[in-house]
Amino acid sequence: MVVTDGVVSLKHLVSMEILSNEEVLGLIKRGLAFKEKKVTFSLDRQYFAANLFFEASTRTHKSFEVAEKKLGLDVIEFDAKTSSVNKGETLYDTILTMSALGVDICVVRHSQDDYYKELIDSRTIQTSIVNGGDGSGQHPSQCLLDLMTIYDEFASFENLKIAIAGDITHSRVAKSNMQILKRLGAQIYFAGPKEWYSSEFDVYGKYVAIDDIINQIDVMMLLRVQHERHDGKESFSKKAYHQHYGLTEERYKQLKSSAIIMHPAPVNRDVEIADSLVEAPKSRIVAQMKNGVFVRMAILEAILRGKT
């Protein structure tokens, strides 16, 4: 990984842990430059990208596709339901095939934690891997668009009070964000059901009751309740969750005037956040979606630069 004149070069992007603070800020600023149309990018040859999503996705999948097309890449269609995966082909062999076909970048989402390790360690696979989410592990591109949204608002992370609230244990978004936000100087608070929190996160922040900090925080980062990872074992109703842990209209009124609300989406309305607040003045949920395209352009550009 290299940063030259503020522009990042990468071979892969599989985890936030592999990025230095300089690289993180470089990608954020490059994303903002794309957003503000201050830079252009041209390819030196034909490049191919494939988006391999083995879990459901709307925002990540389609924003990567838009980003790829904006940069001029040829996007290869892939549908897991009609691929040889249904004949028993492994993920490794699927990516090996893509590499053999000359695909330059594979964006992959998979239910297996750390699926990418055998791919980036392979001596045969030449395609670059961008992690679009691995199980309950990491989601680096979502993290970077979250960081871009915060940076665009506050121009710094130092001493910002950020609450990460909800289904923390099952959230790859939370795990990616807590690590890098702590490193960038933010103060992290965790809120939500105790059963969805682990003491391993104590090194990044403090577990608190949401009502104890609601009037102090700069960023309220809400997390989706991941029903698909609970096996139907939730101990409370959607209504009870909203009342005890969600962003209700009453809690919204207690937020600082400068505070912003974030959510990686999809949103469970009237669960994590009141339906009326999804597009409220303090909400940056739509801004996050928009920023996703531009920061993913920065990620893809960094990988393409790593190939030259």
UniProtKB/Swiss-Prot annotation:
Subunit note: Heterododecamer (2C3:3R2) of six catalytic PyrB chains organized as two trimers (C3), and six regulatory PyrI chains organized as three dimers (R2).
InterPro entries (UniProt xref): Asp/Orn_carbamoyltranf_P-bd, Asp/Orn_carbamoylTrfase, Asp/Orn_carbamoylTrfase_sf, Asp_carbamoyltransf, Asp_carbamoyltransf_Asp/Orn-bd
Name used for this protein in its record: Aspartate carbamoyltransferase catalytic subunit
SUPFAM superfamilies found in the cross-reference section: Aspartate/ornithine carbamoyltransferase
Pathway(s) the chain acts in: Pyrimidine metabolism; UMP biosynthesis via de novo pathway; (S)-dihydroorotate from bicarbonate: step 2/3
EC number: 2.1.3.2
UniProt KW keywords: Pyrimidine biosynthesis, Transferase
Annotated L-aspartate binding sites: K87, R172, R224
Lineage: superkingdom: Bacteria
UniProt record, GO biological process: 'de novo' pyrimidine nucleobase biosynthetic process; 'de novo' UMP biosynthetic process; amino acid metabolic process
HAMAP family named among the record's database cross-references: Asp_carb_tr (MF_00001)
Coiled-coil regions listed in the entry: none
Residue stretches spanning the membrane: none
Gene Ontology, cellular component aspect: cytosol
Pfam family, one: OTCace_N
Purpose of the protein: Catalyzes the condensation of carbamoyl phosphate and aspartate to form carbamoyl aspartate and inorganic phosphate, the committed step in the de novo pyrimidine nucleotide biosynthesis pathway.
